[in-house]
Structure formats: structure tokens, C-alpha cells
Amino acid sequence: MSKFTHINEQGNAKMVDVSNKNITKRTAQAHSSITVNETIYQQIIDNTNKKGNVLNTAQIAGIMAAKNTSTIIPMCHPLPLTGIDVQFNWQINDNTTYTLNITAIVSTTGKTGVEMEALTAASATALTVYDMTKAVDKGMIIGETYLESKSGGKSGDYRR
């Protein structure tokens, strides 16, 4: 009935059967960001936020999010992830705003890709920074979240 991969013959949602796919090394890298004011920036780099170490907590949240992606994205397969890395890079915009660029890199050896895990990790990392610093300023801006690259699998490699 349907040519959609995640819809069954009755028109209802289904998770795709990947049992016949080849096992390959798969990686994905995703980006997100959050722009903060100078007070929050100083608290983060000086590690003086009242809730604790913002970047360490956000990094752990990103790792946990990648590991739990299949529990929050309905058609995502649970995967045995072989590596997760969350990295940070500050961009100083002017004397009043600072952007924390977040890179999440996820890898596995499996039958389906890890793009959603990388995107979920990057998103959760930015959300955790917001959560830990919102008492200082609720005007932070979470920026674009997107896939930077992926490798492995039938569709091949992708680079933004």
C-alpha cells in the first residue's frame, strides 16, 4: 500500500526491519550551539555556576542522550554504540555575547546509522547548558542543530 519505509500496509507506523543489512562501521558528527551573555560565559569558564560544572554535566548529558535515543525517537533502532565524544569550542561574538559550539561524534559497528544519536547528543548538550544557567539569564539562544557528516552504510558518506 505505501512506499514509505516506516508505514505498514495498514497505514500505521512501524520500525524498519534492518536484519538483512550489512554490518559496517558507521559514524556521525552533529553540531549545535548556545549563545550566552558575559555573566554566564564567565561562570562557565571559571566553574563558578551554583549548579556545578556546566560543561562536564552537559557533556555527560549528551553522552546519555546518545545512548538513549531509541527511547525518545519512536522509529530509531536501539544500537550498541562504540564511541561517543562531545566537544566544545567558544566563539566570542562581541563583548556581550559568547557562543558555545557543540560537536557530538558517535560511532558504532552495526546495521543502521548513528545520525539521530549524534543529533540527540548535540541537542541535549545545549539544553543542559540552558538548564544549568537559566537562573542567571533566560534569554540564551540555542542555535541551529544539524548533521555535519556521516560515514558508512548503504547511502555512503555525507559531509555538509
UniProtKB/Swiss-Prot annotation:
The protein's Enzyme Commission number: 4.6.1.17
Catalytic activity as recorded in UniProt: (8S)-3',8-cyclo-7,8-dihydroguanosine 5'-triphosphate = cyclic pyranopterin phosphate + diphosphate
InterPro entries xref list: MoaC (IPR023045), MoaC_bact/euk (IPR047594), MoaC_sf (IPR036522), MoCo_biosynth_MoaA/MoaC (IPR050105), Mopterin_CF_biosynth-C_dom (IPR002820)
Binding site for substrate: M75, C76, H77, M116, E117
Pathway noted in the entry: Cofactor biosynthesis; molybdopterin biosynthesis
Gene Ontology annotations of biological process type: Mo-molybdopterin cofactor biosynthetic process
Example GO molecular function: cyclic pyranopterin monophosphate synthase activity
Active site, renumbered: D131
Keywords: Lyase, Molybdenum cofactor biosynthesis
Family (UniProt): Belongs to the MoaC family.
Role description: Catalyzes the conversion of (8S)-3',8-cyclo-7,8-dihydroguanosine 5'-triphosphate to cyclic pyranopterin monophosphate (cPMP).
UniProt-listed NCBIfam families: moaC (TIGR00581), PRK09364.1 (NF006870)
Complex and partners: Homohexamer; trimer of dimers.
Protein's recorded name: Cyclic pyranopterin monophosphate synthase
